[in-house]
């Protein structure tokens, strides 16, 4: 019996090749495109057209699933609230969990009677017989690896998901797109968040939802160096665009939403030897009850660094870095790795915890 699979199609080259590969391997493919953003002329419109074109070319059905309310509630509202509270949220991991994979699997199972889904993400999944857990791994192409954004997927979702591109490089993907003669073969990769593509910049997007609120830019002693029009325009570690003159380079060290202040200091002041992580999801291992030695990635393009991860109170972990790290940003994800294997991850806390660990 031919196995069926729902393939998430964004209209880009990666998801197009994922669908074409599975189709060539004998799967009965159903393309599904998520309608994410409200309003006409948004970024998703072109994607819908391109996804439909790919399905027509492959001779497979194409479905459109309306997830606009989910996207509004879980992404737009989440971003606006976070930036307003002085943190820098990571929308992509949140979107993968709450808007893309979960709803797509639910639609596949309940509306189509299909138990497998696939996407064009660069990551790998394997089943560990010893632990009886599905493990999330980095992609073969480390430059395109997207496991950082997928750490929050559940065991149920990993068990049902295929990543056809995980074992190949982006160069091979482009070659396959040409070989399949796909209509998206020459389409450029997206360089920004879909929100930025739709609104021009993150600043423009946030200004649409958050009213200007003037405040002070101060140094670590509290001396006023300048003024700002809203803390949502700033992020930890930021140097450019501060609008203040100083004898030495200054960086954003802290955002204080209570006092509506941007606190700046030298580069060393923007570094930290530890941070706390909440809203944890343990992927490839059960939740640890003792400290573990591993690597952590604290932003998408940063190199992994060695840490001690210590179980803490309130279902948090404390990360102690071997060397101080610059610009640890509350709201971003801290994803733990053992080599290529994603152990788990969570969201960096805005404040340090003071209670002793386990």
Curated annotation (Swiss-Prot):
Annotated disulfide bonds: 95-194
Highest taxon of source: Bacteria
InterPro entries named among the record's database cross-references: MnmA-like, MnmA-like_C, MnmA-like_central, MnmA-like_central_sf, Rossmann-like_a/b/a_fold
Active site: 95, 194
Interaction with tRNA: region residues: 144-146, 299-300
GO molecular function: ATP binding; tRNA binding; tRNA-uridine 2-sulfurtransferase activity
Pfam family, one: tRNA_Me_trans
UniProt keywords, alphabetically: ATP-binding, Cytoplasm, Disulfide bond, Nucleotide-binding, RNA-binding, Transferase, tRNA processing, tRNA-binding
Alphabetical list of PANTHER family matching this protein: MITOCHONDRIAL TRNA-SPECIFIC 2-THIOURIDYLASE 1 (PTHR11933:SF5), TRNA 5-METHYLAMINOMETHYL-2-THIOURIDYLATE -METHYLTRANSFERASE (PTHR11933)
This protein's name: tRNA-specific 2-thiouridylase MnmA
Organism: Synechocystis sp. (strain ATCC 27184 / PCC 6803 / Kazusa)
Taxonomic path: Bacteria, Bacillati, Cyanobacteriota, Cyanophyceae, Synechococcales
Gene name for this UniProt entry: mnmA
